[in-house]
Amino acid sequence: MKYLLPSAAAGLLLLAAQPTMAANTGGYATTDGGDVAGAVKKTARSMQDIIDIIEAAKLDSNGKKVKGGAYPLVITYNGNEDALIKAAENDICGQWKKDARGVEIKEFTKGITIIGTNGSSANFGIWLTKSSDIVIRNMRFGYMPGGAQDGDAIRIDNTPNVWIDHNEIFAKNFECAGTKDGDTTFESAIDIKKASTNVTVSYNYIHGIKKVGLSGFSSSDTGRDLTYHHNIYDDVNARLPLQRGGQVHAYNNLYTGITSSGLNVRQKGIALIERNWFENAKNPVTSRYDGSNFGTWELRNNNVMSPADFAKYNITWDKDTKPYVNAEDWKSTGTFASVPYSYSPVSAQCVKDKLANYAGVNKNLAVLTAANCN
């Protein structure tokens, strides 16, 4: 089922002109990004503009490099790459061999917020390395080139305290013949790895993605705390996320059209899966592909309450060639530690009925509350 997300306003709206955001992200992240005292505010019309603005912010007034950055940044992006996105859509199998395009934010810890204006779009990614306090909001990422070069839409490496909020990320849930490793027509929507922790992923609309996201890249990269809330995943294959160890809190998400597997909890990780809506989903909660060190989950107040609901919501299961655990009995296998932040989840039914009005871009960063569920 294709979800059509309505726009909250027409035309180009400079979202950065809104009041300073609160650091309560509804998850483990506690950052305002660059939207703090002393911030320098810039407008970018292109990927290169963003790169140049960030590079300039690494230097003091004398042109000397400052460790961690010279000042916090708020970058408003108003570029439009719809033509590149459309060309990529018309040449799906030609994208993976192209060079990856992206903005690398490396070793910047002063804080950066990148926020798109309504109507903006990007055919490039944003890649974080050894940085902290980064916020990415209202960005529309489509059909990233460079699948063979790890051309993710958003990549978070060695970077704590990140908020990914109200974005749209999309491609084609399809694999072209001859791709590198057999699965790189397009790379990930959001990969979080290499000791990155305290990350909140919220109110994003992610569709047509084969490999949605990693939480950890190896069996030794396991310690992180991540929150995924109020996201819509539509026509996606797997990795919602692929969790290697650590803790994941997934609440008030809508999962529809999962073609391989959903939340894959591995390497002794634990996930609190709370008040989500699952439909038309294959293996929505599982631990597979490792063959050992299974993860565990606590299932709390989702629309699916027992195996009796599987047929109603078209929930199906299959086996793996290695040892695996599926949530086929729809029972909790672990107990999640207390959640250390405040959050106010709505019912799973409200997620189904109302979330499309709030998730994704061009929604003026609106959030879904119980008052909106009536």
From Swiss-Prot:
SMART domains named among the record's database cross-references: Amb_all (SM00656)
A Pfam family annotated for this UniProt entry: Pectate_lyase_4
Cofactor(s) this protein requires: Ca(2+)
Gene3D superfamilies with a match to the protein in the record: Single-stranded right-handed beta-helix, Pectin lyase-like (2.160.20.10)
Entry EC number(s): 4.2.2.2
Active site as annotated: 239
Enzyme class at the top of the EC tree: lyase
Disulfide topology: 93-176, 350-373
GO biological process, one term: pectin catabolic process
Keywords assigned by UniProt, alphabetized: Calcium, Disulfide bond, Lyase, Metal-binding, Secreted, Signal
Residues that bind Ca(2+): 150, 152, 187, 191
Similarity comment: family membership: Belongs to the polysaccharide lyase 1 family. PLADES subfamily.
GO molecular function annotation: metal ion binding; pectate lyase activity
Gene Ontology CC annotations of this record: extracellular region
Protein function: Involved in maceration and soft-rotting of plant tissue.
Signal peptide: 1-22
Source organism phylogeny: Bacteria, Pseudomonadati, Pseudomonadota, Gammaproteobacteria, Enterobacterales
Subcellular location(s) of the protein: Secreted
Co-factor remark: Binds 1 Ca(2+) ion per subunit.
Pathway(s) it belongs to: Glycan metabolism; pectin degradation; 2-dehydro-3-deoxy-D-gluconate from pectin: step 2/5
Catalytic activity line of the entry: Eliminative cleavage of (1->4)-alpha-D-galacturonan to give oligosaccharides with 4-deoxy-alpha-D-galact-4-enuronosyl groups at their non-reducing ends
Protein name per UniProt: Pectate lyase 3
